[in-house]
Amino acid sequence: MDTKLQLRTYRRWDGLTADAVALLTSPREDPLAIPLLVSPSTAHARAVGQAVAVEVGVAAGLQGRTASALRRELSQSLLDMDPQVDPWSGSALTLRIFDLLRPDDPDMAAVSEHVQTCRVRGIAHADWTTAQQFSAVLQSLIRHSPAVLEQWRAGEDVDAEGSALPWDKTWWPHVWRLLHDDGHPDPMTQLTQLCSALGAAPLRWPSCVWISPAAPEWQDYSLAQALS
């Protein structure tokens, strides 16, 4: 893959599309090697593909991928990870959290008190609801504040501003650390491993066009850098 990273910003979609088409249809040593197109959505990729077809008559083999889909594809091929099994998202993460909410764990005092209060009030399944809510919190932190999670892993139980967590949230870092006991590398570790593997692996794409919003997520930025 061409290792020259060029960053371009656009205010208009037509200007972006014109440049993307020029890059995707430029001459290459192996005409059968299809460039990689990464876009925010399948709709964006389809629009670029249609523009390529208008320019050269056909867009055969050009299949756009979102950044998350590319991460899954590369993780499967380079790290042998099953893209259908993600212990750090959805119901899988909720279930793992639920299994850790033990009433005899002193670090779970806030959760135990909440669940007991709900039972007295006749509210069922408060522990499962709590697991669902914390699963959503973790997935948001993974996307937007991975540094906080790294601090928790290191034993620094603080919020995004570096302040101590309130009592009702002191169990959050405890559960985050417990989630690592089953050996599943967290998303930050997975991405580090993937980026390292990319540095040593031959890739089938001769070049890459990566269309990103103005403020890409950190995972997307790191992967784009690793591909450059």
Region locations from a protein language model:
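An N-terminal domain-cap segment
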Residues: L23, E29-L32
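Basic/charged alpha-beta structural segments of nucleotide/phosphate-handling enzymes
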Residues: S39-L203, A215-W218, S228
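A generic structural signal for alpha->beta connector loops
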Residues: K4, I34, V58-G61
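Conserved RecA-like ASCE P-loop NTPase motor core of nucleic-acid helicases/translocases
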Residues: P31-H44, C208-P213
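Well-ordered alpha-helical segments embedded in enzymatic catalytic cores
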Residues: L16-D19, Q190-L194, S222
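Short, flexible loop segments at the rims of nucleotide/cofactor-binding pockets, characterized by
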Residues: T9-G15, G183-P187, S212-A214
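Catalytic-core regions built around general acid/base machinery
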Residues: L223-L227
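N- or domain-start disorder-to-order transition segments that initiate the globular core
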Residues: M1-L24
